[in-house]
């Protein structure tokens, strides 16, 4: 997102450069104080440019002072470029700050999601432990039972069905009228029951 904004900013700077320079020239012609500051700043910049050129080994340029018109042209160009550069830097800083804030919100949302998942896993693990204790209690009270985990069925419904089935069988044994009835019910045995994992 930063690069598109920079492109828009560069186009904006190019479109505003000439009108801004023109307005600075008009203001410099009407205001003596602003005129003097623009001319003085332009001449100082020109002298610095000459010194840097000489320091780099270029001796072809002669140290000539700028006249008023040339100084105004250079000064207005410097002021307009400095202003537009500050606008571009401001846009860049704003976009960088906005992108950073957006990334921060995404990271916070991701951290909250991980936290919620961890809490759900803890609840599920606690449920599994409780159901495991129930299964162990049933097996300890009925040593001949063979209860194992079936991931394709619901644990709670399977346990309820298991208990209900054995309650019916125990009631049938208690209510058996004859020895044959008792043997018939007992011969069926206690079926093995599949207990599933928690969904």
UniProtKB/Swiss-Prot annotation:
Record GO biological process: regulation of lipid metabolic process
Any Pfam family hit: OPA3
InterPro entries xrefs: OPA3-like
Coiled coil location: 98-141
GO terms under cellular component: mitochondrion
Entry keyword set: Coiled coil
TM region positions: none
PANTHER family associated with the record: OPTIC ATROPHY 3 PROTEIN, OPTIC ATROPHY 3 PROTEIN OPA3
Family of the protein in this entry: Belongs to the OPA3 family.
Entry protein name: OPA3-like protein
Lineage, uppermost ranks: Eukaryota, Amoebozoa, Evosea, Eumycetozoa, Dictyostelia
